Amino acid sequence: MGILDIFGGGKSPERATKLKAKVTQKYGGPEARQKAIQQLGEMDLPEATASLLARFTITVEPATTDTDEKEHVFGLIRSRGEAAVEPIRTFLRRNDQASSWAMRLLRDVLPADRYVTAVVEHLRELSEVYTRDPEKKLVLLHEAQSLDDSRIAPTVLPFLEDMADDVKIGALRALGPKAYPEAREPMLKLLTAPETARRVQTGAIEAIAHSGFGVQGYREKVEALLPEPFFVDKAGILKRRGAPGPGQSE
C-alpha cells in the first residue's frame, strides 16, 4: 500500500473496496457520493467495478439525482467492456436487488450468443435455490421471453414449480411462445392442480393456447376452468377465439 492509499488517495484494490461505503451513502449531501463515483471511475480495477455496481442497490432523493447518478455509473461500467463482465456476474449472483441494471449491462457488453449463455447459466443457478425476494428470477425470466435459443425452454421449465406465483407466471410467459413439447404436461398439471391460484391458471391457459398444445388427458378439467375467449376445439387443442391460426399473422 502506498502513501496515497494511507491518506485517502491512490488507486489500490483496497481503496476501491473502501469507497463502496461512500457510494452507498443514502443520506446527507450528494457530494461525497458523487466524488467517490468519480474516483472509482478512474480506477481500472475489478474492485472498483464492484463498488460502482453497489450504487444500483440504493435509491436517493430527489429522484432526478438518483437517476442521473445511476446512468452515470452505468456508462462508467459499460465503458470497461469485457473487463466488467465477471464483476457484473458476481454482483448478480450475490445480490437480489438491482438485477435489472446488471442484465442491462450484460446485454450491452456481451455479444448476443454469450449473453444468452449468461442468462441460461444464471437461470440454472436460480432454479436450484429458494429466494425470499423473487425480483432476480422475474428479471431473468423476462429476459428469457425474448431470446430464441434451444436452451431457454428446458432451463425455464423448473420455475413452474417455484414457490412464488409471480415466478410461475413469469415462467409461463417465457414458455408460451417457445411451444416446447416437454412443457405441455407440466403446464396442464399446474393449470388443473386444485391449489393453483386463479391468476396462475390464467397464465397457464394463455401459455398453453400460445403453444398450440392439446389437452388430451385433461380435457374435462381444463374446460371447467376456461374463461372466454378460450375453448378446446374438436381436436383437443386449446385455443383463443379470434386468434390467428398457424402461419397467420395477428
Label every PLM stretch briefly.
Residues 1-11, 30-45, 66-82, 99-114, ...:
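Structural detector for internal amphipathic alpha-helices that build alpha-solenoid repeat scaffolds
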Residues 9-24, 45-61, 81-93, 112-127, ...:
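Amphipathic alpha-helical scaffolding segments comprising HEAT/armadillo-like alpha-solenoid repeats
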Residues 28-29, 60, 65-66, 94-99, ...:
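Short inter-helical turns and helix N-cap capping residues of alpha-solenoid HEAT/ARM repeat scaffolds
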Residues 219-221, 234-237:
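Alpha-helical oligomerization segments
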